[in-house]
């Protein structure tokens, strides 16, 4: 299973969080709880700004 780990910036609280680019579950911000990623069956639909690719596989 190839995919990237991505650092995403939360638009609501300025938190940065690392998540898997092909997330199978909804990913919420650990600080404020807003949705950062929604699964789509492939690449996740990101709801924040991508800051960096932490690890590319």
Curated annotation (Swiss-Prot):
Zinc fingers (C4-type) by residue: 10-32
Q: Which organism is it from?
A: Natronomonas pharaonis (strain ATCC 35678 / DSM 2160 / CIP 103997 / JCM 8858 / NBRC 14720 / NCIMB 2260 / Gabara) (Halobacterium pharaonis)
Query: What family does this chain come from, according to its entry?
Result: Belongs to the eukaryotic ribosomal protein eS27 family.
Q: What is this protein called?
A: Small ribosomal subunit protein eS27
Pfam families attached to this UniProt entry: Ribosomal_S27e
- Annotated Zn(2+) binding sites: 10, 13, 29, 32
Q: Name one GO molecular function term.
A: zinc ion binding
Which top-rank group of organisms is this from? Archaea
Gene3D superfamilies of this UniProt entry? Zn-binding ribosomal proteins
Name of the encoding gene: rps27e
